[in-house]
């Protein structure tokens, strides 16, 4: 009898301990999940703040001028939380999902997805390409220039180029190709020996105007072209460059690869942020000037192209696109990185249009790598009048 009571006591104690362990484990698990939920909420709030930071003028908010650069990091972190909740507590999925829902506008701006739709008959092809001085003539002693060959193959109806400056030999070679492709063209320079942008068109160019803004080396030009009975405004832009040197880009690549440590990372990071912020402050009034020009001509048919030197989550992109349709967001797919030099992959080249145009199959073509930019092109079809 005593032995039986002792056995019952042992069983009871073991049961109590198991219950205590279960309770303790449950408490630890609950605390851990609450901790993860808090971290997820913090990630969502930061993601939202950064996603809508493109409303902030860099001149007034210097520190946040380039916050958009880290937006994809928080998108990815939030996605990792989504996977975690699916594995451990499905109700928690609501946190990252609501984050993406509230962040829909910047999310779609940064990485759009659209159902592909072939361009209809009558659509015109528009291409914008920072040609990096045609990648330097000395690189191609055989006389074959991939960028010119690519342009010839694309057969764009309207072509806007940035960094199109060449020497006398280069100019002769460019002209020998482009004169056969386009009857109408114009070039403009920020100053003698400075940045050069160019437009080539299958339609007559009837006027040209420089959009005035402060810059030592960059510029925007507005043209009127005549297509049938329509007069279309074409705006070609090359906004303030980042000013990053080869050494700066090399430092950035080293940071990404983890080749720098400790104070070296901190020093290089501060230096890069300072340079990028300085460029953003210069770029903001340029973007404002372009946006004012667009606002002044609301109701007109407008196609705007160029190298903004700023990401989709930026003040420059936001203010210029306010009264226009971003053709890549409307008809492109994926992040569409158009700059690829020095370990930096960002979409900084754009095609936009007024509401009387419908964009189709906007694409950043990564097949040609001779410039530090990839070309972006799109088909545009005039909408029928209501």
Regions of interest found by a model, annotated:
Residues 2-176, 189-195, 287-288, 382-386:
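N-terminal, active-site-proximal structural segment of metallo-dependent hydrolase catalytic domains
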Residues 32-47, 52-83, 94-97, 210-211, ...:
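Metal-dependent phosphoester-hydrolase catalytic domains
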Residues 100-121, 138, 148-149, 158-254, ...:
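Structured beta-strand-rich core segments of catalytic domains in phosphoester-bond hydrolases
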Residues 123-135, 231-240, 269-272, 276:
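Active-site-proximal beta-strand elements of phosphoester/diester hydrolases
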Residues 124, 155-157, 230-232, 298-301:
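Loop/turn elements at helix/coil->beta-strand transitions in domains of secreted/extracellular proteins
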Residues 129-131, 163-164, 239, 307-308, ...:
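Active-site metal-binding loops of divalent metal-dependent hydrolases
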Residues 152-156, 179, 205, 295, ...:
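Sec-exported extracytoplasmic/periplasmic mature domains
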Residues 249-275:
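A solvent-exposed, charged loop/short amphipathic helix patch at secondary-structure junctions
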């Amino acid at each position: 009898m005593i032995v039986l009571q002792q056995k019952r006591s042992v069983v009871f104690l073991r049961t109590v301990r198991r219950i205590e362990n279960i309770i303790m484990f449950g408490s630890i698990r609950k605390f851990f999940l609450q901790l993860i939920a808090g971290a997820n909420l913090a990630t969502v709030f930061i993601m939202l703040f950064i996603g809508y930071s493109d409303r902030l003028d860099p001149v007034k908010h210097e520190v946040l001028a380039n916050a958009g650069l880290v937006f994809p990091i928080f998108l990815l972190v939030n996605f990792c939380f989504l996977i975690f909740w699916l594995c451990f507590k499905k109700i928690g999925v609501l946190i990252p999902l609501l984050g993406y829902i509230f962040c829909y506008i910047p999310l779609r701006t940064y990485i759009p997805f659209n159902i592909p739709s072939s361009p209809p008959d009558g659509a015109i092809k528009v291409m914008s390409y920072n040609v990096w001085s045609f990648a330097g003539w000395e690189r191609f002693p055989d006389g074959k220039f991939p960028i010119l060959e690519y342009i010839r193959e694309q057969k764009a109806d309207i072509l806007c180029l940035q960094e199109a400056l060449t020497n006398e030999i280069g100019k002769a070679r460019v002209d020998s190709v482009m004169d056969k492709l386009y009857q109408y063209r114009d070039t403009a320079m920020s100053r003698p020996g400075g940045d050069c942008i160019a437009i080539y068109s299958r339609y007559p160019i009837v006027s040209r105007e420089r959009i005035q803004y402060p810059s030592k080396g960059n510029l925007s030009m507005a043209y009127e072209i005549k297509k049938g009975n329509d007069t279309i405004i074409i705006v070609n832009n090359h906004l303030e460059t980042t000013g990053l040197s080869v050494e700066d880009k090399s430092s950035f690549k080293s940071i990404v690869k983890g080749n720098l440590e400790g104070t070296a990372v901190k020093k290089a990071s501060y230096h890069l942020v300072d340079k990028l912020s300085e460029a953003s402050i210069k770029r903001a009034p340029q973007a404002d000037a372009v946006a004012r020009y667009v606002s002044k001509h609301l109701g007109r048919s407008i196609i705007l192209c160029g190298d903004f030197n700023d990401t989709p989550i930026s003040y420059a992109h936001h203010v210029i696109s306010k009264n226009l349709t971003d053709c890549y967001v409307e008809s492109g797919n994926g992040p569409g990185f158009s700059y690829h030099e020095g370990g930096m992959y960002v979409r900084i080249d754009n095609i936009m249009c007024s509401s009387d145009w419908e964009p189709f199959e906007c694409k950043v073509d990564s097949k040609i790598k001779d410039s530090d930019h990839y070309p972006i092109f799109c088909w545009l079809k005039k909408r029928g009048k209501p």
